[in-house]
A protein has these predicted regions:
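Compositional signal for N-terminal targeting/processing segments
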Residues: 1-253
Length: 253
């Protein structure tokens, strides 16, 4: 049975489909994409229009990314991440976060002691170990991580490979846990989630079994794509207004 992740990008152009939505917004710490402009769009459209939302600051994944890059000074990693959490929280407040009563800002502590999350992680690890297709996909993404975190010429050390697999599994488990277990089933992220999207497209039956659900509910919205569409519509309207103004201008005698 194939399950296609519903693309809600067109529906959310007006916000109508978000009226009853529970929205999950993961934010990568240290990712310069999340500018004040992008965060303002998240607040004014996705959060304001939703039933309720969770902004998830991915401090645990940030920790793993430091480790993958070879950083071993634990205190320095923890200090850097704490500063990044404080900076992001402060930015969100400055942009008007507190005017929205339907949103929470959380980090990994939100679910780290929940046995359901640990169960999703364990089940994913088992799937990757036992399913040859999932194993191949994992290897492919680990190879991409090697370039992303270290460059083309960095050798793949055993510890680095282990950490990259851990990053991939925990990133995927976070998405599944928040959308399918906690019920924040509309996920808004910069762009496609890679491995988790592949699982929905190619291993839906296995995911339903893994999660103990008769149907999968996650819907994904690419924030990057949505913003591009908004800018394109705005540009088109501006050109239309300019054309009308030019045509309507009276001819001087």
């Amino acid at each position: 049975m194939e399950h296609v992740v519903k693309d809600a990008r067109d529906e959310t152009a007006t916000g109508e489909s978000l009226a009853e939505a529970r929205v999950f917004i993961p934010i990568s710490l240290g990712n310069h994409y999340y500018s004040s402009e992008v965060l303002s769009a998240l607040l004014s459209h996705f959060i304001a229009e939703s039933q309720c939302s969770v902004i998830f600051l991915c401090d645990r994944l940030r920790y793993l990314s430091y480790r993958i890059r070879g950083e071993t000074h634990e205190a320095r990693i923890v200090t850097n991440i704490r500063l990044q959490l404080e900076q992001m929280n402060r930015t969100l407040v400055n942009l008007g976060l507190n005017s929205h009563s339907n949103v929470r800002v959380v980090d990994w502590s939100f679910m780290q002691d929940d046995p359901r999350y640990a169960g999703v992680v364990a089940s994913l690890e088992r799937l990757v170990e036992e399913d040859s297709w999932a194993q191949q996909q994992t290897d492919r993404y680990v190879a991409q991580f090697a370039v992303r975190f270290g460059g083309f010429d960095v050798p793949l050390h055993e510890d680095s490979i282990r950490l990259q697999r851990q990053y991939l599994v925990e990133e995927t488990a976070l998405s599944l846990y928040m959308t399918e277990v906690r019920g924040f089933n509309v996920e808004v992220y910069r762009k496609g989630m890679g491995f988790v999207d592949d699982l929905y497209s190619n291993r839906a039956t296995e995911l339903m079994s893994l999660l103990g659900k008769p149907a999968l509910e996650r819907r994904f919205i690419s924030l990057e794509h949505w913003l591009d569409r908004v800018k394109a519509r705005t540009s088109s309207k501006s050109r239309s207004c300019l054309t009308v103004a030019t045509v309507s201008r009276p001819v001087q005698a």
